[in-house]
């Protein structure tokens, strides 16, 4: 870290660090979106910066003999000033069903539409996959010039899905993906309440436990 950065006030250091994290995430999504990139975590360590990439197809992100990872590491160092980046790629299927990640579902819909598949058919396929995966609730919105020259949207919802409040902001997963087709730009928004999610208003009252009867002494 340079001398001017050391003299920055604490709040400015925090803002600079968050800005750099945002720039790293934006770059990774731009560079790796077509290779199954889902999300990333950026952690500062004594040895440098550890970047954990969650992907649907890790082998495509790593590249042949690690070529893509090396390229990304070089760009992060030279262009974004990341100190000693250490990149790990994790297969999300080992953590949770891929269908529980809205970005996976949104990219599947976008890729199918880019191949000429009708949006309604793609939505129904995604709905079936989400239901089979056990999602607690979900919403899929496709917007654009769907059937006429005027832009509109079509929405499909299922199950219990909160749209406002703490749970909607912090627990319900959301992703937005855009795809450019011949008629124009289409937007795909996916919200998912994963199977393991427990809403704040969901609780169980345990039945009272009766104490064991005290045996009378003879």
Swiss-Prot record:
Which UniProt key words apply to this protein?
Answer: Ribonucleoprotein, Ribosomal protein, RNA-binding, rRNA-binding
Q: Which domain of life is it from?
A: Archaea
Q: Does the keyword Nucleotide-binding apply?
A: no
- GO annotations of cellular component type: cytosolic small ribosomal subunit
What CDD domains does the record tag this protein with? KH-II_30S_S3_arch
KH type-2 domain span:
2-71
- Which InterPro entries does the record associate with it? KH_dom, KH_dom-like_a/b, KH_dom_type_2, KH_sf_prok-type, Ribosomal_S3_C_sf, Ribosomal_uS3_arc, Ribosomal_uS3_C, Ribosomal_uS3_euk/arc
> What GO molecular function annotations does the UniProt record carry, in alphabetical order?
rRNA binding; structural constituent of ribosome
Single GO BP term: translation
The record's subunit annotation is: Part of the 30S ribosomal subunit.
Function per UniProt: Binds the lower part of the 30S subunit head.
According to its UniProt record, which protein family does this protein belong to? Belongs to the universal ribosomal protein uS3 family.
- Official protein name in the record: Small ribosomal subunit protein uS3
Organism the protein comes from: Pyrobaculum aerophilum (strain ATCC 51768 / DSM 7523 / JCM 9630 / CIP 104966 / NBRC 100827 / IM2)
The record lists the lineage as: Archaea, Thermoproteota, Thermoprotei, Thermoproteales, Thermoproteaceae
